[in-house]
């Protein structure tokens, strides 16, 4: 049994590290074999809830201590997360005169919390992983208020947004699963520790299923507007990382911490954006497309950014450990 867990753990680490490539492969398969993945769109909220539960299982009480022990960087990251990406999303939609569905999808991505993949990318970049984890936790736990509020304020020009319905959606697919995961980890910490290397696999499988489903049911529309969405998504992501890094430098934050902030700001929980689009904006089916394409793109750009930052000044002092 122990050997089996080790093998599964290695597979989990491999899949997590190369999630961008895996998403691309499954997206291509789903594009051509649409019937094989279309069914997953009926379970988008369940998949994202499972992914969030998996994230919760990895969070320990010590992680919250780290959050409160470094309030300056956490606050800077939090403010950057919920200002830069939403405002850039809104600006791009206005600048490029996006149709309603796509504008809504881009704004949904911009208003979501940081994605869990950012922690892996931060590690690869030689950034401060503890800070990255802390920012992901705080932005995720604040999402039931911040995400609906920002979507209500920014997307109202395109569609009618029900603030309360969105709050309920985020609570169901994010807050409850994450808190449940944290509670189980707190009660059964030793047992969870034994399978800790396997846990990322839960999120990987869930996100791959979500994106594959969206690609399969929107294949024809991807052909007609995929390049436009990719261009907007790429600009959105690169602006987020660039402005996040610039803000960190302006505030004289250390190299490895600035790396973590830039990655955290630029990489979003796009799976949540897809789930919210599916649950709350059924009349705007293309609103799921920016989230799906963002999921592919930000893993690619994040990995490239990590390679650049890892080879830069300051990486020798980088915090590569989750604990300090």
Predicted regions span which residues?
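Alpha-helical transmembrane segments of multi-pass small-molecule/ion transporters
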Residues: 1-324
């Amino acid at each position: 049994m122990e050997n089996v867990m080790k093998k599964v753990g290695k597979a989990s680490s491999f899949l997590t590290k190369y999630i961008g490539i895996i998403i691309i492969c499954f997206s291509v398969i789903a594009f051509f074999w649409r019937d094989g993945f279309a069914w997953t769109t009926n379970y988008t909220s369940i998949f994202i809830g499972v992914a969030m539960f998996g994230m919760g299982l990895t969070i320990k009480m010590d992680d919250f201590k780290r959050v409160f022990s470094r309030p300056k960087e956490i606050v800077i990251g939090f403010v950057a997360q919920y200002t830069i990406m939403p405002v850039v999303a809104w600006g791009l939609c206005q600048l490029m005169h996006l149709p309603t569905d796509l504008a809504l999808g881009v704004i949904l991505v911009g208003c979501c919390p940081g994605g869990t993949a950012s922690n892996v990318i931060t590690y690869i970049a030689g950034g401060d992983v503890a800070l990255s984890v802390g920012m992901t936790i705080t932005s995720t736990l604040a999402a039931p208020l911040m995400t609906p509020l920002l979507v209500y304020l920014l997307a109202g020009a395109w569609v009618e947004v029900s603030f309360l319905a969105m709050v309920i959606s985020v609570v169901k697919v994010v807050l409850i699963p994450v808190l449940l995961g944290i509670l189980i980890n707190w009660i059964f910490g030793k047992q969870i520790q034994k399978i800790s290397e396997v846990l990322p696999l839960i999120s990987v499988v869930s996100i791959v299923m979500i994106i594959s489903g969206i690609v399969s049911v929107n294949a024809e529309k991807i052909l007609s507007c995929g390049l436009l969405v990719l261009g907007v998504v790429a600009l959105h992501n690169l602006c987020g990382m660039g402005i996040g890094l610039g803000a960190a430098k302006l505030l004289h934050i250390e190299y490895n911490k600035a790396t973590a902030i830039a990655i955290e700001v630029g990489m979003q929980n796009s799976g949540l954006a897809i789930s919210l689009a599916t649950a709350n904006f059924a009349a705007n089916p293309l609103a799921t497309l920016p989230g799906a394409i963002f999921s592919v793109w930000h893993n690619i750009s994040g990995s490239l950014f990590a390679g650049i930052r890892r080879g830069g000044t300051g990486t020798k002092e980088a915090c590569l450990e989750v604990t300090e």
